[in-house]
């Protein structure tokens, strides 16, 4: 997965081992030659807290017309719990997805989401990036991977790839949001 912004590009390679466990993550950060593009600091939860508004563009694997929808994302912290609420206005009406995570007690750069069939983790990475992925992939279970990048203090992009129970790619969503509160 990869994102481009200005003269910078961020790519991520995620490898699961033969036991379907998340094994290796390679974050590739690039910029055009002869540019003094400063690297952004590692992403933190504090960078995300608040209200974000923008839009999501989803392309399905059948390559039909992309679906564009407005989004509102809110991040809140309550002790060691983190609540992320995503509101989207889809063709089927308003949809709200709320996810609750807990901070890893040994590493503040990791969030654990446990309410799904697959345990999910978010890893805060260098250069304002983060990865959200299953800790392990289960046979015949659909899953999502998400690469996020804080491009500027109040501008955030997220690419979400969705896979079906056969492991086939079904959709790709690009979310671009600005912090409004």
PLM-predicted stretches and their roles:
Residues 1-70, 78-83, 90-95, 140-143, ...:
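Amphipathic/hydrophobic helical signal segments and adjacent flexible N-terminal regions
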Residues 145-147:
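Beta-propeller and closely related beta-sheet repeat lectin domains
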Residues 1, 64-138:
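Central antiparallel beta-sheet cores of small beta-barrel/beta-sandwich binding domains
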């Amino acid at each position: 997965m990869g994102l481009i912004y200005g003269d910078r590009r961020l790519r991520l390679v995620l490898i699961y081992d033969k036991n379907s466990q998340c094994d290796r993550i390679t974050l590739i950060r690039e910029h055009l030659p002869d540019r003094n593009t400063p690297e952004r600091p590692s992403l933190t939860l504090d960078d995300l807290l608040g209200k974000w508004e923008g839009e999501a563009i989803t392309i399905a694997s059948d390559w039909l017309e992309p679906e564009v929808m407005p989004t509102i994302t809110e991040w809140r912290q309550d002790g060691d719990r983190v609540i992320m609420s995503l509101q989207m206005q889809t063709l089927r009406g308003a949809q709200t997805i709320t996810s609750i995570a807990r901070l890893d007690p040994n590493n503040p750069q990791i969030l654990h989401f446990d309410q799904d069939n697959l345990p999910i983790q978010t890893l805060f990475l260098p250069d304002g990036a983060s990865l959200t992925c299953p800790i392990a992939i289960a046979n015949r279970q659909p899953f999502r991977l998400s690469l996020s990048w804080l491009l500027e203090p109040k501008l955030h992009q997220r690419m979400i790839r969705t896979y079906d129970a056969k492991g086939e790619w079904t959709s790709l969503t690009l979310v671009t949001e600005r912090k409004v509160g």
